[in-house]
Swiss-Prot record:
Appears to be allosterically activated by the binding of pArg-containing polypeptides to the pArg-binding pocket localized in the C-terminal domain of McsB. Disulfide bonds: none annotated. Residues 24-254 form the Phosphagen kinase C-terminal domain. It comes from Bacillus velezensis (strain DSM 23117 / BGSC 10A6 / LMG 26770 / FZB42) (Bacillus amyloliquefaciens subsp. plantarum). It comes from the Bacteria. It catalyses: L-arginyl-[protein] + ATP = N(omega)-phospho-L-arginyl-[protein] + ADP + H(+). A motif (RDXXRA motif of the pArg binding pocket involved in allosteric regulation) lies at residues 337-342. Belongs to the ATP:guanido phosphotransferase family. This is Protein-arginine kinase.
Length: 363
């Protein structure tokens, strides 16, 4: 399969589409945790109860269509190959926990903006993932899916506590709202160490690209709410919206300051990273993330011309181990992965430049 066709098939909407403020906000995510009323939580339920949840979703929702979202398809974790599960995780469509659940499943929309995880930490986890800064659109879609499911499922709900969940931190609205942000300006100007504690004071948490316990590779940070009880869904989304909007403003100011005060140094950093990506024959994940962040910053500041700004979103995912092995058609040793990663990046950059040259020639 050619890289062009592989990318077309592999990319989710949030990776290839542009959204509001997408130079800084890569994606907006809403996740709702829900449970069946008369079935024990996943930590305590029987195999029969777990199977019945999957079966109910297959009967009522798989193959069905929801307006503005499209048709859903059920993927059972027990039927998916380890590599397929890893790719779904790398695309942020399922969690690492779900890949290990013997009775896990995922109901996925056609454009992959909506994924409904089954038998993870909770019976149901509705996720809506949109490109750019679109928390309001994401919560609207999540509520639409939630109402659709509730037509067939009686949720565990208490008048005082709200939606009941396996983890006490999710009780209440069951809502986790998050934005994935590219913040190289704030990192390079050494402001993130000051900003993160301030964000934590507001009841929000800052994590890496793959959530809890992950490192902020490539200057990509995930900011989400911590509290779900005692606040309405609207308040949670509004609070995160407000903090994200301030971060966007601060990041833009930091980038402008860098460009004005350290232009040569910044250009040198950007073009060195571009040179590495364009010419390397082996490259590890960590160096890839650093170089992609530099190049994306260069694109956004107009230092590098002729490259799509979505290249960071694409290559941060396509160069993960699961995708590399899927593209190569089998398992790879670490050094083989590093070589395959370098080849994929070089070919992707070449495709981009060739497409832009053709556009210029046709004008």
């Amino acid at each position: 399969m050619s890289l062009k066709h592989f990318i077309q098939d592999a990319l989710s909407n949030w990776m290839k589409q542009k959204g509001p403020e997408s130079d800084i906000v890569l994606s907006s995510r809403i996740r709702l945790a829900r449970n069946f009323e008369n079935i024990k939580f996943p930590a305590r339920y029987t195999n029969e109860e777990a199977s019945s949840i999957i079966q109910q979703f297959e009967d009522h929702f798989s193959g069905k269509e929801l307006p503005d979202i499209g048709q859903f398809h059920l993927i059972r974790m027990s039927e998916a190959q380890p590599l397929e599960k890893r790719v779904l995780m790398e695309k942020h469509l399922i969690s690492p926990n779900l890949t290990e659940s013997p009775f896990g499943g995922c109901l996925l929309s056609e454009n992959e903006e909506v994924s409904i995880m089954l038998n993870e930490e909770d019976h149901i986890r509705i996720q809506c993932l949109f490109p750019g800064f679109q928390l309001l659109n994401a919560i609207k879609a999540a509520n639409q899916v939630d109402d659709w499911i509730e037509e067939k499922v009686d949720y565990a709900f208490g008048e005082k506590r709200g939606y009941l969940t396996s983890c006490p931190t999710n009780v209440g609205t069951g809502l986790r709202a998050s934005v994935m942000m590219h913040l190289p300006g704030l990192v390079l100007t050494r402001q993130m160490n000051r900003i993160i504690p301030a964000i934590n004071q507001l009841g929000l948490v800052v994590r890496g690209i793959y959530g809890e316990g992950s490192e902020a590779l490539g200057n990509i940070f995930q900011i989400s709410n911590q509290i779900t009880l005692g606040k309405s869904e609207q308040d949670i989304v509004d609070d995160l919206n407000s903090v994200a909007a301030q971060l966007i403003e601060q990041e833009r100011s930091a980038r402008e300051a860098l460009y004005q005060t350290s232009k040569i140094e910044l250009e040198d950093r950007v073009f060195r990273s571009y040179g590495v990506l364009s010419n390397c024959r082996m490259i590890e994940s960590k160096e890839t993330a650093k170089c992609l962040s530099d190049v994306r910053l260069g694109i956004d500041l107009g230092i590098i011309k002729g490259l799509s700004s979505n290249i960071l979103n694409e290559l941060m995912i396509l160069t993960q181990p699961g995708f590399l092995q899927q593209y190569s058609g089998g398992a790879l040793r670490p050094n083989e992965r590093d070589a395959r990663r370098a080849a994929l990046i070089r070919e992707r950059l070449h495709l981009e430049m060739s497409a832009n040259r053709q556009e210029d020639d046709s004008i």
